[in-house]
Amino acid sequence: MNTTANTTNIIVGLSGGVDSSVTAALLKQQGYQVRGVFMQNWEDDDNDEYCSIKQDSFDAIAVADIIGIDIDIVNFAAQYKDKVFAYFLQEYSAGRTPNPDVLCNAEIKFKCFLDYAVGQGADTIATGHYARKEVRNGVHYLLKGLDRNKDQSYFLYRLKPFQLERAIFPLGGLEKPEVRRLAAEFNLPTAAKKDSTGICFIGERPFREFLQKYLPTDNGKMVTPEGKTVGEHVGLMFYTLGQRKGLGIGGAGEPWFVAAKDLTKNELIVVQGHDHPLLYTRSLVMNDLSFTLPERPKAGRYTCKTRYRMADAPCELRYLDDETAELVFDEPQWAVTPGQSAVLYDGDICLGGGIIQTTDKPVIITR
């Protein structure tokens, strides 16, 4: 728990889930002046069967009532659409696979929400993320959560120092089973509620059907690297590198995997076998760099995650210019995907990272 003696007025982002519920209950129990905010960030189809916003808001209000705190419902839908969703569609249109949760944290939860909370007189905000923060010589460090299965520092790497200074993560030192147990002890209605796995704030819905509402689709061939047609795709944007399920390619032999997208020919390049060489990468180039500390890390040796929950991969960081860097891995990495984030670590410290643009394999072909 990372608070300071004069941090008494805390506004908690209450999502209607168990993690934020326990966050608020713990802070209230510890004597802080706590208020809640439920963020409504999606309105396009919030009455359909897949959107949980209404139920989530009811759950957040019920939690606030049991804990004994006030709660505001604040609408950031316009900001979400402009800052997060537009980027989400742009990246899919370009053949990449974005991570909206990363941008949602940087632009909505730790910008719009933070600005709102400060305007309401809060000393700091709290969220239910599984991450930790330490202050050393006045510098705020973002650290991995102790529960390695739930660590969410990967999604927080774009937080700037001023955002970290105003944020706390009370669950960072807890494991998920303990959080569930505390929720039951606090008699919270979210104690047994399942974790959300959908797109940030949009919910769990059939992805293909959802994306088709916003982007045109164009069927094309699935081909091998040698040019042999083995199937048909329903639109390049619906596939990601390393994907195995949903390809619909029959026949004998090992399973098929997506290895690349040829945007010029509208072809999906597929290979057989998890260990096919085209699925492995020794280096990547990332841009749109963002770091959590006042000074960017020096070029040198670190570890990196190129997707959530992967094991840290030793690598060397080399800057190409102020906005671009190259990572060279000690060992080949599987299915490194443009549009996803490459996040750097020094031990448990999350240093920041960038958006993967290219790798040493031609995975997004545009000419």
Curated annotation (Swiss-Prot):
Keywords: ATP-binding, Cytoplasm, Disulfide bond, Nucleotide-binding, RNA-binding, Transferase, tRNA processing, tRNA-binding. The active site is at residues 104, 200. It comes from Neisseria meningitidis serogroup C (strain 053442). GO terms for cellular component: cytoplasm. This is tRNA-specific 2-thiouridylase MnmA. Residues 99-101 are annotated as: Interaction with target base in tRNA. It catalyses: S-sulfanyl-L-cysteinyl-[protein] + uridine(34) in tRNA + AH2 + ATP = 2-thiouridine(34) in tRNA + L-cysteinyl-[protein] + A + AMP + diphosphate + H(+). SUPFAM superfamilies: Adenine nucleotide alpha hydrolases-like. One of its GO terms (biological process) is tRNA wobble position uridine thiolation. InterPro entries: MnmA-like, MnmA-like_C, MnmA-like_central, MnmA-like_central_sf, Rossmann-like_a/b/a_fold. Belongs to the MnmA/TRMU family. ATP binds at residues 13-20, 39, 128. Its EC number is 2.8.1.13. Catalyzes the 2-thiolation of uridine at the wobble position (U34) of tRNA, leading to the formation of s(2)U34. It is found in: Cytoplasm. Disulfide bonds join 104-200. GO terms for molecular function: ATP binding; tRNA binding; tRNA-uridine 2-sulfurtransferase activity. HAMAP family: tRNA_thiouridyl_MnmA. Transmembrane segments: none annotated. Coiled coil: none annotated. The record marks 129, 340 as: Interaction with tRNA. Residues 150-152, 307-308 are annotated as: Interaction with tRNA.
